[in-house]
Amino acid sequence: MTMFNTIKREFQYGNQQVVIETGRIARQANSILVHMGGVTVLVAAVVKSDAKEGQNFFPLTVNYQEKMYAAGKIPGAYGKREGRASESETLTSRLIDRPIRPLFPEGYVNEIQITATVVSSDKTQSADIAALIGASAALAISDAPFNGPVAAARVGFINGEYVLNPTLEELKESDLDLVVAGTKSAVLMVESEAAELSEDQMLGAVLYGHQQQQIVIDNIASMAAEIGTAKQQYTAPVRNQTLETGMKEQFGTQVSDAYTITDKQARYSKLDEIKDAALAALAGDAESESYADTVSELKEIYNDLKYRTVRDNILSGKPRIDGRDLETVRALDVQVGVLPFTHGSALFTRGETQALVTTTLGNTRDVNMIDSLAGTIRDHFMLHYNFPHFSVGETGREGIPKRREIGHGRLARRGVQAMLPDSDRFPYVIRVVSEITESNGSSSMASVCGASLALMDAGVPIKAPVAGIAMGLVKEGERFAVLSDILGDEDHLGDMDFKVAGSKDGITALQMDIKIEGITPDIMEQALKQAHAGRIHILDAMNKVLPESRTEINAHAPNYAVIEINPDKIRDVIGKGGATIRQLTEETGAVIDIDDAGTIRIFGENKAATKAAIAKIEAITAEVEVGKTYEGTVARIVDFGAFINVLPNTDGLVHISQIADERVENVSDYLKEGQIVKVLVQDVDNRGRIKLTMKGIEQS
C-alpha cells in the first residue's frame, strides 16, 4: 500500500509540458506541486475554518519566494540564506493576489495564507505563471468558497506573432511582455510592458492569452471535482432593512449633495459629518448591548449608500464627483527644472494628484546588482515610488516601501523603460524617484508623466515623451460607463482599474484589475480608445513645456567620455595589482572602467576631471611615432648606449654612436641616469624595439 494518494493532471501549455499534482508533499495544507517546463513550484494554501472575533476585512496573504537552491546557487546575503523578499518576489506576490482576491464572496473574512515556493528552476523562464496556476489549484481543492479556478498566461509578440509563455531569451526579442489572468468566462487582471504597440495589438494579446489558458482552467476544475472537497458554507449577513431604509430616506439626499463638492478634503469632511449625524439618529440607545453591532452595521450601510450614490449618478448621466463628464481629464500643470541642484526634475499636477519627480545620473559603479535564479542582473535603470501619508492629509509611520509602493513604482517603470536609450549609447545608470506630494487617484500614472519630463530635463535622450492615464468603469447589468482619469473615490467605487501609459505612437504599459465578471472585449476596446484620447491630451500639455530631451546633460551630472586604446596597453593603465588605475582615480576623482577590447569609459565629476583622466590615460598608452622628437629621462646606462624613457612604460635605446656628432668613448661622459634629454625616434622594429638618436638635436 502506497504512503501517498497522489492525484495528477498533465497537459501541454504552449511549448511547456505542465504537471499539476497533489497528495505527495505538504499534505497538512492544501498543496499543489506545479511542474511547468523547467520550473517547479510548491504552493500551499491554508484556510481557516472560522473568522477571528471582530474581523472586518478579508485577511488574504500571498507570499511568493524563490529559493536559491532551486537553481543550484548559494545566496550571497549575510548568513548565506534567503532573507527579506526581493522586489521581484514582492511583485509576483501581488501578481498572484490580484486575480484571486475578487473571487471570494463579499463579506468573507476567514484568514487565508498562500505560500508559493520555487524549488527547482532551469533558469530559462519565469516561475510566476506556474505559481499563479498553483495558487488557483490549491484554492480549488480547498474548502474555501473560491469562485475559481483562475489561470494565467504570459504573452509575447515576436515578429508580428503572439507567443504563448515565451522563455526569458525569447522575451529579449519580444515587443511585449504581458501576463493575463482570468476565469473560464472573464479576464480579471492584465500586467504588461510593450514597445509602443497599438491598442488593437494589446487587446488582441489579452484575448489570445485568455483563450489559451482555458486548458489550465479545465484541468484544475477536473482535479478539484475528483478530490471533491466540500466547500465552507458562507452566507453574507442579511442587512437590517429598517436601518437601510432609514439611512437612505433621511440621509440619501445629503450624501448625493456631498458628492457635488469638488474639493476632496471638503467633500470628505462633509461625508464624515453626515455619517456622524446618521449614527446619532439611527444607532439607538448607546447603553444597549446591541449598540456596538448596530453602529458597525450602520457604517457598512452608509458606505454602501455612498457606493450606490456615486454609481447611480454616473450611470444616469450626471456629472462625476468633481463635475467632469466621462472623458474629460482633470486640469493639468507641468513644470520642469524645479529643483536646481538635481540632475533633472519635474512637478506634474493633475487635479488633486501631484508628483515631484527627479532623475539622477550615475556612473557604472552605481548599477543595481540583483541576485536572481537566472543569475546576477545588472540593472541600469531604477524607478522608485514613494507615497507618504501627508499626500492624502493623513498621519502615519514612515518606513520601508510597502507592496503597493513597490507595485506602483514597477508600473511607472514599465511605462517609461521602452523609451530609454540603449546603454551602449547612453551608459549612465539612471535613477528616477517619484515623490507623491498629493494624491486623489492615478498617482502611478502621474509618476509616468513626471518621470518622462524629469528624464528629458536631465538630458536623457529618450525616444519620445510618455504619459499615463487611469481609466475606470461602472457597470450595472447592460448599462456601463467608462471613466477617463479617475479619482480615488471612483477607483474605490468602480468595477475596473485600467491604467495605460504610452507615447503618441503606442502603448508602453498596461495594467488592468477587474472586480466583476462580464467585462466584454467591446468594453475593453472602448476603454483603450478613450485612454488613447486622454493620453494624447496629456502629452500635448507636456510638450508645450518640454517637447524633447535637452541637448546636453545637466551640468551637475557626471561628465562622460569614452576612448579606445590598444588592448596591449590595458595592463599599463591598470598597473601592478591595480596600482596605476587607483592612482588615476585618486588624482582625478574620475571613475574609470576598462573592458577587454580596450574601450575605456570615464565618468568625471565635471568636464575638467574627465579631461584630466583622459590626458593621463593617453600619456600612459601613447605609442612613439617615428620621426618625432621626445623629451625623455635617462633610465639606464650600458656600455653600448643608454635607455631613455620617452613615454610611460616605454623605453628606447640611444646607441653609443647616436649620442653625439663626435665619437663617444664612454657613455657616462655624456649622460647620467635621471638626466633629461631630447631624442628623435629613428625606427621601431617588428619586435617593438625603439631606436633613438641625439645627433643633430639641440639639448636644453
From Swiss-Prot:
It is found in: Cytoplasm. It comes from the Bacteria. It is an enzyme of class 2 (transferase). Transmembrane segments: none annotated. Keywords: Cytoplasm, Magnesium, Metal-binding, Nucleotidyltransferase, RNA-binding, Transferase. Its cofactor is Mg(2+). Its EC number is 2.7.7.8. GO terms for biological process: mRNA catabolic process; RNA processing. GO terms for molecular function: 3'-5'-RNA exonuclease activity; magnesium ion binding; polyribonucleotide nucleotidyltransferase activity; RNA binding. Residues 558-617 form the KH domain. Pfam families: KH_1, PNPase, RNase_PH, RNase_PH_C, S1. Residues 627-695 form the S1 motif domain. It catalyses: RNA(n+1) + phosphate = RNA(n) + a ribonucleoside 5'-diphosphate. GO terms for cellular component: cytosol. Component of the RNA degradosome, which is a multiprotein complex involved in RNA processing and mRNA degradation. This is Polyribonucleotide nucleotidyltransferase. It comes from Psychrobacter cryohalolentis (strain ATCC BAA-1226 / DSM 17306 / VKM B-2378 / K5). The lineage of its organism: Bacteria, Pseudomonadati, Pseudomonadota, Gammaproteobacteria, Moraxellales.
